[in-house]
């Protein structure tokens, strides 16, 4: 985990989408009670789990959009007492998950003093952005993405074909 700001850590992992080599970011936020919220969790590895557990107890798993749920089941199995928050579209798509709260339905009491949630309506992915009030940090998933420069011939073809660069 890389410290980002007071109470915020990030970890970056590889992702391949539509043939493009991208990165994806997991953000860890500390709540008032010292527990953690994992936003868009990456693949669960022993090293990553140990790094997260060193920061505090995992209390919340957060799928910020319909595309950021791929690894959340691994974390839910590892931390069965953690509450799982997900967009409404995942309720039908991921019947294998125990979704404790549909984002936007009711406020999460544990977030009220430190996190504001804003559901971006009209966006097919049903993305929710978070504002971490203690540091005034905006946490996003797909609304903002730094793809970087194409690394090889495949990227040079695939990026423009997908409207990037």
Indicate residue ranges for each PLM-predicted region.
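Zn-dependent metallo-beta-lactamase
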Residues: 1-32
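Metallo-beta-lactamase
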Residues: 2, 6, 16, 37-38, 86-127, 133, ...
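Short, hydrophobic/aromatic-rich segments at coil-to-beta transitions
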Residues: 5-11, 37, 112-117
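Glycine-rich phosphate-binding "P-loop"
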Residues: 10-14, 31-44, 101-105
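Active-site environment of divalent metal-dependent phosphoester hydrolases
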Residues: 18, 45-46, 67-71, 91-94, ...
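Divalent metal-coordination and catalytic microenvironments
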Residues: 29, 65, 84, 130, ...
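Active-site metal-binding motif and surrounding structural segment of the metallo-beta-lactamase
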Residues: 43-87
